Amino acid sequence: MANGRGKTLVIHSVKLPVMDGVAEYGQMGLGPEGAYRNREFAGEAIRSEIRELWKEDVVFDPQTSGGLLLAVPSDEADQLAAELGKMDISGGIIGTVTELQDKYVIFD
């Protein structure tokens, strides 16, 4: 999404929703093998400033539990989140798109 447009996605890790129990299991070092392959694949395109190792593992977890990332114009984001809420669909603003920085994706 960012690579082809010369942009950077800045994802705010504190805004990422996680299921109950994920932090506890992650702190025990339990996670899928695919997360490590995803991290390796993304490699040089990503910079992580996440301080908790378990949360960094979560962002690379291949099991999204139906998760979906949408990029919408910033002036429409709040309205979209409200409309999703009316339909009992969980949604929220977890980041922004900026001009290209040193990486295509930054987790802060």
Tell what function each PLM region has.
Residues M1-D108:
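Glycine-/charge-enriched secondary-structure boundary and capping motifs
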